[in-house]
């Protein structure tokens, strides 16, 4: 009986630990150019990223491939979609939209020991891509 209780306790602790780890990505991050803040949030078990501050809030999504969206402001734009936690501080199977060029890329996110993110956008395989370092910050939305 003691072994069963011990096993169940360890199983529950391991499960809760894994769940907390997936949510470790949630927070606010400054982009490498320090001209935008990205808020990562969870919805229905997947992770998304939205621009909650931009240096020039009047900037429009003028490079969007959809002409109907080119008049939208970049502020508030969801640029990261559908990431799943894959363990080892990695979130995969998502996409990232780059409003500077209007292109959407496959994407993988890793978190370092300081809580910062390395966001790798790529086409096809992650070997052919670019990584940007986003710094975790405390930020209160206006």
Predicted feature descriptions by range:
Residues 1-20:
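Bacterial Sec-dependent N-terminal signal peptides
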Residues 18-24, 142:
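Sec-dependent signal peptide cleavage junction
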Residues 99, 110, 124-125:
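Short polar/acidic secondary-structure junctions
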Residues 21, 31-32:
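Short, glycine/acidic-rich beta->alpha junctions
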Residues 26, 32-100, 104-106, 139:
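Central antiparallel beta-sheet cores of small beta-barrel/beta-sandwich binding domains
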Residues 87, 111-113:
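Residue-level recognition of beta-strand termini and adjacent short loop/turns
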Residues 116, 123-142:
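Edge beta-strand at a domain terminus
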Residues 108, 116-118:
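C-terminal terminal-subdomain/extension
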